[in-house]
Amino acid sequence: MRIIFSLKNIRTLLVIVIAALVSTEGRGQGSESLPPRALMSKLKWRCVGPYIGGRVVTVTGVPGNNNLFYAGTVGGGLWKSSDGAQWENITDGQLPGTSSSIGAVAVAPSDPKILYLGTGEADIRNTVIPGNGVYRSADAGKTWQYIGLRDTHSVSAIVVDAKDPNVVYVASMGHLFAPDPNRGVFKSTDGGKSWTKTLFVDNDTGAISLVMDPNQPDVMYAAMWQAVRKPWGLSSGGPGSGIYKTTDGGANWINITRKPGLPTTVLGRVGLSVAASKPDIVYAIIQAKDGGVFRSDDAGETWNRVNQEWKLRQRAFYYMTIYADPKDPNTVYAPEVDALWVSHDGAKTFTKLRTPHGDNHIVWINPDDTNILLEGNDGGATISKDGGKTWTTEHNQPTAQFYHVNIDDQFPYHIYGAQQDEGSFEGPSSFAQGMIPFSGWHRVAYGESTYSVPQPDDPKIP
């Protein structure tokens, strides 16, 4: 006798089992039947693929170790690579709730075992996941401790004092969908045991960029961004947006937004960078009618617009970052839609470095060997050791964001999923030889997909 299984049979059986269990729940405490909650708790998750990277908005390496890297994903926690080729998640099971969305990560320059992690991304799409505060690790990411700022929601940057690992600054955009008093710059001098808000403009304005003079850690620059997200749109820019500077570790901040040479119109998002080899050189990429890339050679007192190309700021709300080479103050990187742009003449002209995926958000430049780059984009984290000529694959980090998943009636059933900026994929739920290989998955659509649904009894019909 031949028995034919179908997903419809399994669904029916599951409904009967759950119904039976539910019916026993109300029979009093003497019932020996387990409730559905206990039944479901026995199930275990397993990764089935497709092992593709998802959006990464924060990355960092470790000076002194050319093969150690960290990448924060916006839906899959923090990942670590010890060889530049393989990645492992180091926050699974340790960060509660929505903390799987990572907005910022920083390594203490004076003690690379100390890491700070800010949850909730600040690149304000309409599908962002809020975070629930800041975490600290004292053992290079093996264990994590919650250290506060639960209501910051979206952390855009973390900066650690170059000499004291317990002095740390956090830039917060706050609640992105409403005015929020938890926006601004926060400081701790005791490793996160206590916090003080050092820079606040108003409830509509958060801190989107924060950089430090590595030679004088009391000198910092902050970019404040007046922005509120709505499900149907974004309000970017206003009188709250601006650039601020402190020379006393955040005790006092000076508004330098209207210094000579900077835009005279309303500002939107701003990205900042200090040239470590010559910290009087500061770069700013500014969203404004008269915006562009600006450079100061006197620590922010005067500025010159050195570039106004639209290609560097065509999606200002999503990227708008700039990074100066730690050794060469005239080499500058600007991530953008379809490339990582690089300039070798102080941001006057830029050439394109192609990356494995578009929508580029961030780049870390190794201060010991500036040919080593770690870049984050909508397809994951990728590493170059030749100045951006070649990059590692992003198909080794299962962090892509799935909007929706579906299954068909095959046995074993197949899985269909639509991903943020990675298209839609179809793959098996099991594999006779063990782990499901990447080759077992097939891309069925490209671009920004939301649903991928087959006809249940005929998966060839989408």
Where are these regions (language model features)?
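Cleavable N-terminal signal peptides
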Residues: V15-I16, G26
